[in-house]
């Protein structure tokens, strides 16, 4: 059973469409990856996710970036938007998700999630390469990164840093994955390009202070 968000925050859902809401986080399933890393996965945590996807596409100030890659400056293959500690999130549903994550994971994490980064994968050509969130504290400390996905599913891959078996989770339509413990420094994750026809997806990454 999901908990609907305050009706005053949203237009009434069209007939046959699910209201935007959140399912209990107690239903998340934890998997130990080894070396102190773990992931929690909760499919369909955010209900009415397709409505939220449409709102975020229309209202978030998306922008493209270019980054130095060895001797070249290249386009980042996805659109981005970032919300720092003092910036309001672009939709009340994200405020509710943020609060729920803090309530559930705050005691284990020892601090709240502070920032939100949004990535818009427009089609199978958009991607993110293998990496860990190791800019800042994630390189030396255990931490958590919570990712909510809306829109069409894309595969999030995880593998041990240095190589090893790949763990695959298709994420979309309100799915949640939380990467915790040593995951950012002992494992890597990626959203690879795909030649298959896939629809667009937005991921929302909640992080504590000093983790990027």
Labelled PLM ranges:
Residues 1-212:
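Non-heme Fe(II) oxygenase metal-center motifs and adjacent flexible, charged/small-residue loops
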